[in-house]
């Protein structure tokens, strides 16, 4: 996700964030039938369903990149490959703020070779099924991973707060860990890389 906007209103723990090319989002853990309830409410309030995608995400890192708090990610979605750099920005609020630069690339193999020459190796792989909704000024996504179900809202902090109120989801558990950090906790190590993949049916 990207293009988060950085204005915030005061009150309820919400203030003002710096203006920069950042991704601003909030993640929630989903249990039981909450996803169906929220999707029903999104439809009722006129949200636009933008479809579902399957992703394979590979995280690359190095000692120096970890020290800077950054990661590089290659994401494959169908025939599309995206190269992304992210770095977490600390704040005193309950949303995640990250500097993000992303571009589409044509040759994933060449990008991997370039990253290797720069000293960046793959450390994590996780698969994800993502359904996306456009709701007012924010993007609402439902993510299924091998280790759980989550929802994210991305936009301005004002927009996120408004969506929480309209969808009546303030009771949901907020998740501060990123998907890479959750993969590190719940994934399995294979050939030196921690992986979290869906189980495949059949032989």
Walk through the language-model features, giving the residues of each.
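N-terminal amphipathic/basic-hydrophobic helices that include classical n-h-c signal peptides
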Residues: 1-19
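Short loop/beta submotifs within extracellular cysteine-rich repeat domains
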Residues: 49-50, 160-162
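Short, surface-exposed beta-strand-loop junctions and turns on beta-sheet-rich folds
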Residues: 89-92, 148, 159-160
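A generic "binding-loop/recognition-motif" signal
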Residues: 156
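Long, well-ordered alpha-helical scaffolding segments within enzyme catalytic domains
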Residues: 161-173
């Amino acid at each position: 996700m990207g293009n988060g906007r950085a204005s915030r209103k005061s009150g309820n723990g919400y203030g003002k964030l710096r203006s920069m090319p950042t991704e601003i989002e909030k993640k929630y853990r989903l249990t039981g039938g909450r996803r169906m309830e929220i999707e029903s409410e999104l439809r009722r309030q006129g949200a636009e369903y933008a479809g579902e995608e399957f992703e394979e995400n590979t995280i690359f890192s190095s000692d120096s990149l970890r020290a800077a708090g950054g990661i590089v990610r290659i994401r494959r979605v169908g025939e599309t490959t995206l190269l992304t750099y992210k770095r977490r920005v600390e704040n005193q609020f309950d949303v995640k703020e990250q500097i993000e630069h992303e571009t589409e690339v044509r040759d994933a193999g060449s990008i991997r070779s370039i990253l290797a020459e720069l000293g960046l190796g793959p450390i994590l792989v996780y698969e994800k099924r993502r359904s996306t909704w456009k709701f007012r000024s924010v993007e609402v996504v439902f993510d299924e991973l091998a280790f759980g179900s989550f929802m994210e809202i991305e936009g301005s902090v004002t927009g996120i707060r408004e969506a929480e109120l309209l969808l009546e989801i303030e009771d949901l558990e907020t998740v501060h860990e990123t998907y890479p950090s959750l993969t590190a906790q719940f994934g399995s190590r294979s050939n030196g890389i921690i992986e979290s993949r869906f189980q495949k049916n059949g032989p």
